[in-house]
Amino acid sequence: MYDDQSSSVWTTPPHCRVQRFRQALAALTATLLSAPLASADPLGGRVLGPDGQPAAGATVTVAGPLAVPATTTTDADGRFTLDLPPGTVTLRAFAPGMDAPAVRVDAGRTDLEVTLAVRAVSEVLTVTGAQVDTPLSLAGSSVSVLTREELDARQTLTLGDALRLVPGFTVARSGGPGTVTSIFPRGGESDFTLVLVDGVRANTFGGGLDLSQVPVADAARIEVVRGPQSALYGSDAIGGVIQIVTARGGPVMATAFAEAGGRAARNGAATVRAGGARWQGAASLSHQREEGFTGPAPADGSAVTNDDSRLSQGGASLGWLGVGGQELTASLQYVDTDRGAPGPFGANPAGNFGGVDRTSRGLTARRMLALRAVQPLGGAASRVRLRAEADVADLDIEFRGNFGSRGETRRRHGRVQLDAAATATLGVSAGADVIGESGRSTFITAGAAEVPIERSAVAAFAEGRWQPGDRLSVTAGVRAERITRDALAANPSAFSARPAFAADTIVSVNPKLTAAWTLVPAATPRGASTRLRVAAGTGIRPPDAFEIAFTDNPGLAPERSRSVEGGLVQTFAGGAVQADATVFHNTYDDLIISVGRLSGTSRYRTDNIANARARGAEVALAWRPRAAVAARGHYTWLDTAVLDVDGAAGQAPSPFAVGDRLLRRPTHQGGLDLTWTGARLQAFATASLRGRTLDVEPNFGAFGGLFENDGYHVVTLGGAWTLASRLTLHARVANAFGATYEDVLGYPALGRTLYAGFRVAARR
């Protein structure tokens, strides 16, 4: 419960009630070519960079009497044009590392001139924190965005490494690259974060996910929303949401990179994207391989020969763009991994080390297919937009060893959503969701049979967004969800017998309220500004397949969270310096635990009787004195505690005591990131710092007792040299000073490792 899970090697298949969504999608598709265009006024102009030269490829977005913000990019001469309904709108222009203040203009003007300025944190249009695209400056929730440019500058290959730059999230990796990687959002458990790839859920049944299985080679950006988001996404978004938005469309562009490094590392990727007036597409391939830890095991000096890992990924998308703003998009992704499982061979605090496992391996294969249709009801410059989505996600997992097992997750999802501008300042969204998912695993039955656990959810949601100008944004949303677990046959296993369960249904309602207010706008181009934001919401995570399979409790309910937060964003020097401070308080209720010695609290083996809380503060500082230099730092103070179980004051689940810290959540953690970009040279340095954590005995988990895991600081240094316009050489040294540490007790991190390679980019 309080999280000693290293990985759940495990499963999920689907039970589908998505037929109505298929019918809706087909009906929507049939109307795409016939929708009439609304009357529209052109809005156009030119975007210039800080040097007064045309800013090609800058993003221009307009909010006003529209269902969703209208967006375009500038051409090679910095020019843009948008067709808009008559009226006054708010225009924003931005590019990586720079933006311009929002301006109010009347549709119909074609002579606008907007000049960008260097910003420590530039504007970006986010798609994860609300039902429609929202500028970062109007987000009431805590949102961080990692761009493709930032990932490339730091030579980041994995989602786990990227998230070490985000305040409030603790990343715990069981060794080197490719090993099991978990994330803890603001003190929540490792299955409290929903991960999306272009809107498709990547989590297993019940919310678990190994981040090492989520590549970022094709990511245009990574959006991270902290705090519960079940009002938007329902189940599993109990502690936060991470979304990988892949690149597509635009001018023809192809990239390829390859590198080699210590421990026989071989990494490579290739991407291509292109688009025109009526179509857009993209494709990507990536591969990562590394031998991992190959020296003597710190626990007893024996050889470690089974710590290697491999990941292969492929993805593609193709979309059609109609003259009236219609969109049809299909996308797919495939990821498979293969890694050794030597077990814990590092710290051995209780002397229970049983030797290195030289034969066990874990294999996974994930497949995702998604279809998306958008129909503005009245043309591109419309007050109303209809959107329909359908996606399929399958995950197969196999563990090969003396106690091998197979598992699978199957999920089918359908969604219909209507977005509308009720007035020039009020936007509304409403819709319905259907999710069918199932999980199977031979581990549950300790045999060849696969127990099927099937669950469906039908939800209705609504959201209102009030934006009376460019300084204030208030968003309120709610989602009501009916979650049904199908009847489950009895399991007579002597290991963990379970009676037959009848079908079980629960209804959950989750609200969310956020507000962002620019209290003091910058009075001059080099002035200061002050922005306040607040957010409150709730979240749920229904039981995973193991929790259902190993209980005798037919009414096991979802785990729940409640959260409030407040933040202050202060900029100086026209945005070249930004300080962002947030305080938060999270309460986690109805956590599922094994009742064990807590007699009198429940008549079942497991029940929703545990509770915990987490409170803390996050501070992020960013400084960009000029376009070539950027510095960022963040610090998180986190105070977590195990609370009394329901019905037993003063008692906590074994081996905890009331007031103990939650596992693997440090009180102090932070990071520092420096980059410099010259005409042909580039350099970066990143540092991650983590304080002491409470952890479990590596070999027997919580049954072996609780132990302290020392903190650490790790530095990575790197740089790149552009030899020609299309060819760049790069190198980096991970763990440059050879720190000895363990994210997860018993699993040593890799020492100093050198990587070197090249990147080729071509565009037309």
Regions found by a protein language model. Name each.
Residues 200-226:
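Short acidic/polar hinge/loop motifs at secondary-structure boundaries
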Residues 65-79, 83:
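Short, acidic Ser/Thr/Gly-rich low-complexity loop/linker segments typical of extracellular
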Residues 122, 323, 423-435, 451-586, ...:
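Structural signature of Gram-negative outer-membrane beta-barrels, strongest in the C-terminal barrel
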Residues 230, 243, 259, 271-362:
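Periplasmic-side early beta-strands and strand-to-turn transitions of outer-membrane beta-barrels
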Residues 59, 63, 94-96, 109-152, ...:
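Short, acidic, small-residue-rich periplasmic hinge/interaction motif at the N-terminus
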Residues 135, 143, 160, 164-201, ...:
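Extracytoplasmic beta-strand/coil segments of soluble accessory domains associated
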Residues 1, 467-475, 482-483, 585-587, ...:
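Gram-negative outer-membrane beta-barrel transporters
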Residues 279, 381-399, 518-520, 531-537, ...:
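Membrane-embedded beta-barrel scaffold of Gram-negative outer-membrane proteins
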